[in-house]
């Protein structure tokens, strides 16, 4: 368009349009050098990059204009609109410049425009769906392409022999076979452009799209073999040449796949060591993938197959190694390049069709080619599908076969190949070019416009893409293992057997070699779900100011909700309560209004809940990392501090943990720490009392202090933040060390004020008399308490705390309650328990002295009888730990040192 605008301006020469080079200023009459020019037009120096940028800009603006109307894009595919736009632009250029200026050059197409599209297709291809249908894809790609090429070429040659093609079309059998090889291949660019807008089901899409990618090897081999035979002449072709042609099919296809896998291995291995240079990770992905394409093209192998296998093989390991920002950059950059290249290709196809000097028309050849490619495509799909359905578990029905036959689109690959023909060797090149343009336009425009109504009319199953839930993934993996086990049992090495063997090999060798160790946590799907749930919970927690605020939490229970000072005075309160007391005027308190008090309470809540960042970040510029902005750093710090405070608050409230930063004080000489084991010498022969919650062995929780936190490194990127690490250790090990960490002290825990009764205590008053129950946990479960299991561990402790009764190391001194009501006046006589060695549960005697009436006691008897089997210790192995020196007990203290 820039050239068109420049051509309309008189006096401005344009390079490449018939204009000469930039005129040089001649010296003056006396031979003096020219003076300093204030302005010089240097178009020839920036012509190439400027035109590239201009074409991409025009293509992007065209896509924006097309999508302004949803009705237009829903009826007409985007590829059709781009071809029509190219025809319009080409006509304008031809009318102004009197000749076609731009064409789709084969070198530009194969080296610059095609690689981004194929890389995007291979990198984001669903690998599981691709390998599940690999047999059908290879059948349609290899057998189907060979069938279409030979049948189309032979049929066109027969059409010429029958006299339906003009005699001026000078072509023999080898020429028609060459034309059939380039016109029979399904184009991946056209298939992607049309089928992504139709949204057919996943199986149908992956078969057609996989065929368009993998048939490149067959197309390249057939094109090169037939072109070589044409150059040699039919009289000079030997039998060994045919054998070489068959062998080259395997060399080109397998060689291209091998090149792609080698570069995929190198790419995955390289990204394993980019932890400290994250900024170059997206660059490595594109460079090595493009190097795979160029290497295969240099060795005359299948470049499309090479870059497809490179993207398909490296994605799993690259996604695990690179950072989240790099993954986002790779995704959007790859999609942008592919979309831009596809847009430019279809526009250039439309512009190239305007130049009538490059093609010649023959109606018989054009119509015959259109009929034969449609007929033999449908016939080949029906025959191959009938064979495949004999072995497929889910057969392809007739509707799928109709869509596959109608979806064989041709595109820019066929046009680029026909342009590469040598006119001296192939005299009918101009007729082949015209026929190819008509076939491409017919398949992209006519079939692209009608395939969506056809799919709706046939009621083809559409794709319902959604991210599988954890339950679906679990069942899918379960079925895979079951089917692999069945094949292993019957001795049949089928698809599931080999897939299971590959997964074991990948887990044992490839993942260990190509992934860094920190990537294994990312691969864990359960951990990923847990992490996302935790992040969502934390975000909602931070949004509430760090506290779970509610309407009840915004006011104090003792604060009256008043509106003025007069309503909140002491006299007014006494008057409302009906008190007869007379207060002196000097002692009447001046109470602020309820709104002022609510504002004060809200101020304290916000000051205690909101967190002001303490870290000072210096502005830095790094070549290896993308530094976070101030808001990102502040949000991250607020999130970490709120989560840490929340965990500390939860631990201290639930399990009576006391965190202190002072140094441990020396213990007095006569002071003895309470143990959870009954010592006969200390009790002087008296029966030991029940073990309480305060008397069990303590678990030392190592928590990072604030001073250590403030001295952390202020690097711009610190990704692996493990948070708080709780370390459970035995009391004996801590006491043997002789000292405790400076951030924690061991001290006796004072009694705390009992909280308000819960619902269970209101319904079952005997529970409130138990005090702090000792929770015993098996030693096997408390030796290792992972950080990611803290939540389940705490819930288990809470369950034991609410259900379990206090175990006894010796026979208890309390008796089982009788079924009849208790009499408060009768004294409790200790019962000799020597005859009953079993440990049993007994309701505390405080209930008998509570002063309850007989009716209240009788009402609680059914509840006690229902709960009595639950609270009795029939199995001592689960709740009673036995001797304390061989078991691990846990105690959380509040308000004191552990």
UniProtKB/Swiss-Prot annotation:
Known catalytic reactions: Na(+)(in) + H(+)(out) = Na(+)(out) + H(+)(in)
InterPro entries tied to this protein: Cation/H_exchanger_CPA1, Cation/H_exchanger_TM, Na/H_exchanger_3/5, NaH_exchanger
Cellular component aspect of the GO annotation: dendritic spine membrane; focal adhesion; neuron spine; plasma membrane; postsynaptic membrane; recycling endosome membrane; synapse
Tissue: Highly expressed in brain. Strongly expressed in the dentate gyrus.
Membrane topology (Extracellular): 25-47, 97-136, 197-202, 270-278, 355-362, 422-430
Residues modified by glycosylation: 201
Subunit structure: Interacts with CHP1 and CHP2. Interacts with ARRB2; facilitates the endocytosis of SLC9A5 from the plasma membrane. Interacts with RACK1; this interaction positively regulates SLC9A5 activity and promotes SLC9A5 localization to focal adhesions. Interacts with SCAMP2; this interaction regulates SLC9A5 cell-surface targeting and SLC9A5 activity.
The name this protein goes by in its record: Sodium/hydrogen exchanger 5
Membrane topology term: Multi-pass membrane protein
A biological process term (GO) from this entry: sodium ion import across plasma membrane
Keywords: Antiport, Cell junction, Cell membrane, Cell projection, Endosome, Glycoprotein, Ion transport, Membrane, Phosphoprotein, Postsynaptic cell membrane, Sodium, Sodium transport, Synapse, Transmembrane, Transmembrane helix, Transport
Family designation: Belongs to the monovalent cation:proton antiporter 1 (CPA1) transporter (TC 2.A.36) family.
Sequence ranges of Polar residues compositional bias: 856-867
Region (Disordered): 660-692, 801-888
Function: Plasma membrane Na(+)/H(+) antiporter. Mediates the electroneutral exchange of intracellular H(+) ions for extracellular Na(+) in 1:1 stoichiometry. Responsible for regulating intracellular pH homeostasis, in particular in neural tissues. Acts as a negative regulator of dendritic spine growth. Plays a role in postsynaptic remodeling and signaling. Can also contribute to organellar pH regulation, with consequences for receptor tyrosine kinase trafficking.
Cystine connections: none
A Pfam family matched in the record: Na_H_Exchanger
Transmembrane domains' residue ranges: 4-24, 48-68, 76-96, 137-157, 176-196, 203-223, 249-269, 279-299, 334-354, 363-383, 401-421, 431-451
Source organism, top-level taxon: Eukaryota
């Amino acid at each position: 368009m820039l050239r068109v605008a420049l051509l309309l301006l008189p006096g401005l020469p344009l390079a490449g349009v018939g204009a000469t080079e930039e005129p040089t200023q001649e010296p003056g009459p006396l031979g003096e050098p020219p003076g300093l020019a204030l302005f010089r037009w240097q178009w020839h120096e920036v012509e190439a990059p400027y035109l590239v940028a201009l074409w991409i800009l025009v293509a992007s603006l065209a896509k924006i204009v097309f999508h302004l109307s949803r009705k237009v894009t829903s009826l007409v595919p985007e590829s059709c609109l781009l071809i029509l736009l190219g025809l319009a632009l080409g006509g304008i250029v031809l009318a102004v410049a009197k000749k076609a200026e731009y064409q789709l050059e084969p070198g530009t197409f194969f080296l610059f425009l095609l690689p981004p599209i194929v890389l995007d297709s291979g990198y984001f291809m669903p690998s599981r769906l691709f390998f599940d249908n690999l047999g059908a894809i290879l059948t349609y790609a290899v057998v189907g392409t060979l069938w279409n090429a030979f049948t189309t070429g032979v049929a066109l040659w027969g059409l010429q022999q029958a006299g339906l093609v003009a005699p001026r079309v000078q072509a023999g059998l080898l020429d028609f076979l060459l034309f059939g090889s380039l016109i029979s291949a399904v184009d991946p660019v056209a298939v992607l452009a049309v089928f992504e807008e139709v949204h057919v089901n996943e199986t149908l899409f992956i078969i057609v799209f996989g065929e368009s990618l993998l048939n490149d090897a067959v197309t390249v081999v057939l094109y090169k073999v037939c072109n070589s035979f044409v150059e040699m002449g039919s009289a000079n072709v030997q039998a060994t040449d045919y054998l070489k042609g068959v062998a080259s099919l395997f060399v080109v296809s397998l060689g291209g796949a091998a090149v792609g896998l080698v570069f995929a291995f190198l790419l995955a291995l390289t990204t394993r060591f980019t932890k400290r240079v994250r900024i170059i990770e997206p660059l490595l992905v594109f460079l090595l993938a493009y190097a795979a394409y160029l290497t295969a093209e240099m060795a005359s192998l299948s470049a499309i197959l090479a870059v497809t296998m490179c993207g398909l093989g490296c994605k799993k390991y690259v996604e695990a190694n690179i950072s989240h920002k790099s993954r986002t950059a790779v995704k959007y950059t790859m999609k942008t390049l592919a979309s831009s290249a596809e847009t430019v290709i279809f526009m250039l196809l439309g512009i190239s069709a305007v130049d009538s000097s490059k093609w010649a028309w023959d109606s018989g050849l054009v119509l015959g080619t259109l009929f034969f490619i449609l007929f033999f495509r449908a016939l080949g799909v029906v025959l191959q599908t009938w064979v495949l359905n004999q072995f497929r578990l889910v057969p392809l029905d007739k509707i799928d076969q109709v869509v596959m036959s109608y979806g064989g689109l041709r595109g820019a690959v066929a046009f680029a190949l026909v342009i590469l023909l040598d006119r001296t060797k192939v005299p009918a090149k101009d007729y082949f070019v015209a026929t190819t343009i008509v076939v491409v336009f017919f398949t992209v425009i006519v079939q692209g416009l009608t395939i969506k109504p056809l799919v709706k009319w046939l009621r083809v199953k559409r794709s319902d893409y959604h991210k599988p839930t954890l339950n679906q993934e679990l069942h899918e993996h379960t079925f895979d293992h079951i089917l692999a086990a069945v094949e292993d049992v019957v001795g049949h090495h089928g698809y599931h057997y080999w897939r299971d063997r590959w997964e074991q090999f990948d887990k044992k060798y490839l993942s260990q070699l190509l992934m860094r160790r920190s990537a294994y946590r990312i691969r864990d799907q359960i951990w990923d779900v847990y992490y996302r749930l935790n992040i969502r919970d934390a975000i909602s927690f931070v949004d509430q100011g760090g506290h779970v605020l509610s309407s009840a939490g915004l006011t104090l229970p003792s604060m009256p909700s008043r509106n003025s000072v007069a309503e909140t005075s002491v006299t007014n309160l006494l008057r409302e309560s009906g008190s007869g007391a007379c207060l002196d005027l000097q002692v009447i308190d001046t109470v602020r209004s309820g709104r002022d008090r609510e504002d004060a309470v809200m101020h304290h809540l916000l000051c205690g809940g909101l967190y002001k960042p303490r870290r000072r970040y210096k502005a830095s510029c790094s070549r290896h990392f993308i530094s976070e902005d101030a808001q990102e750093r502040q949000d991250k710090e607020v999130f970490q501090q709120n989560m840490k405070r929340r965990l500390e608050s939860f631990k201290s409230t639930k399990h009576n943990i006391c965190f202190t930063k002072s140094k441990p004080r020396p213990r007095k000489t006569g002071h003895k720490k309470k143990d959870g084991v009954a010592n006969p010498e200390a009790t002087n022969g008296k029966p030991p009392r029940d073990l309480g919650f305060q008397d069990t062995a303590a678990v030392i929780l190592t928590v990072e202090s604030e001073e250590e936190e403030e001295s952390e490194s202020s690097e711009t990127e610190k990704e692996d933040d493990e948070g708080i690490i709780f370390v459970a250790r035995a009391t004996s090990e801590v006491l043997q060390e002789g000292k405790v960490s400076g951030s924690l002290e061991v001290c006796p825990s004072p009694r705390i004020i009992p909280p308000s009764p819960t619902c269970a205590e209101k319904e079952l008053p005997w529970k409130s008399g138990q005090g702090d129950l000792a929770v015993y946990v098996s030693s096997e479960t408390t030796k290792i308490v992972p950080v990611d299991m803290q939540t389940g561990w705490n819930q288990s402790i809470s369950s034991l705390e609410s259900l379990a009764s206090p175990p006894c190391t010796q026979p208890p001194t309390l008796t089982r309650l009788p079924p009849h009501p208790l009499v408060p006046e009768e004294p409790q006589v200790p019962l000799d328990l020597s005859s009953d060695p079993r440990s049993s549960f007994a309701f505390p005697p405080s209930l008998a002295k509570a002063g309850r009436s007989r009716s209240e006691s009788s009402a609680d008897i059914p509840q006690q009888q229902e709960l009595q089997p639950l609270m009795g210790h029939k199995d001592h192995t689960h709740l009673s730990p036995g001797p304390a020196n061989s078991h691990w007990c846990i105690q959380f203290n509040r308000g004191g040192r552990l």
